[in-house]
Amino acid sequence: MPIHVKVVSAADYTAWVAGKNKEMSAKADDPSKVWVLADLKARGEKVYSTNCVACHQASGKGGGAIKALDGSAVVMDADHGKQIAILLNGANNGAMPSWKALSETDLAAVISYTKNNWSNQTGQLVQPAELQAARK
């Protein structure tokens, strides 16, 4: 099988790489993809570390006016809609901000992470499709 090489300018190559990166990101964040718990937890840990840990702490215990996620009735609840609504809309007059700017996959991942971290070992996972439906 012959190999074909196409020589392009640096600008064209950079544009091509950017396009391929967008394609990969779009595939990775397909809200119809069905995830397994281990993969959602791994992604959720990254989302939590980036967006949540400053207030809720690495321990999930929160502090002061910041509610604990570890042992939280909302987090432990089998009704995912309660936690989804808080992440999409915020709560407590803005003390808990809305995170609706995050992708469905990132939101599903961080919810699944909180449901299965610390003492919260629910075995529950939230799929991105649940977030997509809740946004409508």
For every predicted segment, state its role:
Residues 65:
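Peptidyl-prolyl cis-trans isomerase
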Residues 5-9:
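Interdomain boundary/hinge segments at the C-termini of tandem beta-sandwich modules
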